[in-house]
Amino acid sequence: MNKPESETPTVQSQRFKPIPLENLTAEQRVLADAVRSGPRGAVKNSAAAKPGPLGGPFNVFLRSPDIGNIIQSLGAAIRFRSSLPPKLNELAIIVTARQWTSQYEWFAHHRLALEAGLDPAIGEDIAQGRRPAKMSEDEAIVYDFSRELHETQGVSDATYQRALDRFGERGVMDLIAVNGYY
């Protein structure tokens, strides 16, 4: 969490070097096409929408196309088919990114959280490792559930009940899934 939020992982620091599109195998091409033609491809400036080699985690997924395709399909479902509103889903993602010091996910999803309507002050507090002071009830439920899940590897009955009362069983499952995936 010591890196500034605007800093993005560089290609030079990648352990898996980008594979030029013309060097993809048939199986890798299927995966690349699935990523680019799915909902991620419509997200402006995303790793899936940029021309050239796939970036972000998708570049790594190319090394095992069958597994990579399963993972990217799961990720697309968690991100784009969740019962949680995009702002809350992105909030869970950035809480997870900060908890695990995942610079790429923070870089990719902090902007998306703001675009989905998250107050910039909430993002700044999370970036600094602080519990945001001013959150809506829904935001507080997602924040508390996510932090507790990561810090204790479980959630208390009280935290679970708050999430269940507000989001229902599907929402709780979607919240668990987004935290686990990211």
Predicted ranges, named:
Residues 49, 88-91, 127-128, 133-142:
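Membrane-interacting alpha-helical segments
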Residues 168-169:
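Transmembrane-helix boundary/entry motifs in multi-pass membrane transporters
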Residues 2-84:
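Mobile cap/lid helix-loop segments that border enzyme active or cofactor-binding sites
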Residues 132-160, 164:
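Strongly charged, low-complexity linkers/loops
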Residues 57-61, 71-78, 91-97, 126-127, ...:
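Short alpha-helical scaffolding segments that buttress acidic/His motifs in well-ordered protein cores
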Residues 69, 90, 96-116, 120:
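Conserved alpha-helical segments that form or flank metal/cofactor-binding pockets of metalloenzymes
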Residues 110-136:
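Histidine/lysine/aspartate-rich catalytic loop segments that bind and position anionic ligands
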Residues 8-12, 48, 66-70, 101-106, ...:
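Short acidic alpha-helix initiation/capping motifs at coil-to-helix transition points
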